[in-house]
A protein has these predicted regions:
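Interhelical loop and helix-boundary elements at the membrane-water interface
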Residues: 1-13, 66-86, 133-153, 199-214, ...
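Multi-pass membrane catalytic core of lipid/isoprenoid biosynthesis enzymes
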Residues: 44, 51, 69-133
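Membrane-interfacial alpha-helical segments at the cytosolic side of multi-pass membrane proteins
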Residues: 17-25, 90-100, 157-164
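Alpha-helical transmembrane segments of polytopic integral membrane proteins
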Residues: 17-20, 55, 59, 93, ...
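Interfacial loop-to-helix junctions that mark the boundaries of transmembrane helices
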Residues: 36-45, 109-118, 146, 173-181
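Hydrophobic alpha-helical transmembrane segments of polytopic
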Residues: 8-11, 49-53, 121-128, 154, ...
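C-terminal membrane-associated helical module and adjoining short loops/tails
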Residues: 143-256
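Topogenic membrane-insertion module of multi-pass membrane proteins
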Residues: 1-61, 239-240, 244, 251, ...
Length: 256
């Protein structure tokens, strides 16, 4: 029974590995039109990578819940969870960012042969995520908030962009994803938030008045996310993610 939570954690890792397969195969499709302009497209399989990362996030939540329910928490499980999270929410989203940077540069007239150096910022995501997890494992645990952005939250944000790319009907959204500087900003923001010590809401319900306040926050964030998804499609996940940051910072500002 004590190994059941670890099986969930290993499923998280398996989904992260499968996401990497979907991201890397078959790679970008590049062709030219009659005017000699590059026509670049990301493979549709990258959307399945997003599904794997979303699935890993669900499993990551369940393994902790199952461990507490079975009273099977262990030091081994904590370390295994961190190692799995680095792959599923660090390396896999980092490779999504890497592929999008390749796509962004390849869409430019002289961008096919861009130096690899310009793609390396994508690796800040797994580096910052690994640092954040190592700090989490060695810091004194807190029950009321996260210290810095949790790596699954960063991974989910990055994983939403392939769905925006493939299922968005808005040209301006595609133009944003085709802009390498937009990607650099996203990568730097996520990496900074992960290594920061900003207190962000953990939504750990402990009873009393704090529960009622957390429920209100959850309702606000869900309403913003759902309404944004109805208006903007998958880009609504980004809006909901920003709403989570704003609510967290306002909570810290307003709470004595």
């Amino acid at each position: 029974m004590k190994q059941i939570p670890n099986l969930f954690t290993l499923l998280n890792l398996l989904l992260g590995c499968q996401a990497l397969v979907f991201i890397l195969q078959p790679g970008l499709t590049v062709s030219s039109n009659e005017y000699g302009e590059n026509l670049v497209q990301l493979p549709e399989s990258i959307t399945w990578a997003s599904c794997c990362i979303f699935g890993a996030a669900i499993v990551d939540f369940l393994d902790g819940w199952v461990a507490r329910w079975l009273k099977a928490t262990s030091a081994l499980g904590a370390q295994l969870d961190s190692l799995s999270d680095v792959v599923s929410f660090g390396v896999a989203p980092g490779m999504i960012a890497y592929q999008f940077l390749r796509y962004a540069y390849a869409s430019q007239p002289d961008g096919i042969d861009i130096a690899e150096f310009w793609l390396y910022p994508a690796f800040l995501l797994p580096l910052a995520g690994a640092y954040r997890l190592a700090r989490f494992n060695t810091d004194t645990p807190t029950t009321s908030h996260f210290v810095g952005l949790p790596i699954p939250a960063a991974g989910i944000l990055i994983a939403s962009f392939p769905l925006v790319y493939w299922f968005s009907a808005s040209a301006w959204q595609i133009d944003l994803l085709r802009n390498p500087w937009c990607w650099y900003a996203i990568i730097l923001l996520c990496s900074f938030l992960m290594v920061s010590r900003w207190p962000l809401l953990a939504f750990k319900f402990s009873g009393g008045a704090s529960n009622r306040l957390l429920i209100r926050y959850v309702v606000i964030i869900l309403l913003v996310t759902i309404s944004s998804c109805l208006l903007l499609g998958w880009l609504g996940i980004t809006i909901g993610w920003v709403a989570y940051l704003i609510v967290s910072l306002l909570h810290k500002k307003l709470t004595p």
